[in-house]
């Protein structure tokens, strides 16, 4: 019985982490590209992938979905794990 409770707690911790990461998929680009290069809209992503042509549009923020978790998502993930751990210890 004790082993089953541990497995269930670990499962819900991982599940809460995945849910938090999947809901925080908006990436904000401070220097977007003037044109869209496939899935890359950030200037950094364009230069990183050797798409160096084109200029930048200033004072424009581009939002788009990406399968990469942002720092905030990772931070919320660790917070949810800590909360679930503290709650399970009571």
From Swiss-Prot:
Q: Which GO terms describe its cellular component?
A: extracellular region
> Where is the protein situated, by its record's location annotation?
Secreted
GO process terms (BP): defense response to fungus; killing of cells of another organism
Extract the InterPro entries matched here.
Defensin-like_dom (IPR056373)
* Signal peptide bounds: 1-23
Q: What is its main location?
A: secreted
Q: Which UniProt keywords apply?
A: Antimicrobial, Disulfide bond, Fungicide, Plant defense, Secreted, Signal
Intrachain disulfide bonds: 33-56, 42-77
Similarity comment text for this entry: Belongs to the DEFL family.
> What is the protein named?
Putative defensin-like protein 64
Organism listed in the record? Arabidopsis thaliana
């Amino acid at each position: 019985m004790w082993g089953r409770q541990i497995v269930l707690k670990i499962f819900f911790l991982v599940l809460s982490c995945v849910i938090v990461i999947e809901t925080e998929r908006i990436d904000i680009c401070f220097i977007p590209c003037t044109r869209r290069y496939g899935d890359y809209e950030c200037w950094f992503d364009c230069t990183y992938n050797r798409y160096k042509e084109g200029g930048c549009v200033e004072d424009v923020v581009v939002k788009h979905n990406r399968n990469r978790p942002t720092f905030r998502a990772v931070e919320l993930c660790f917070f949810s794990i800590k909360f679930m751990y503290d709650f399970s210890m009571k």
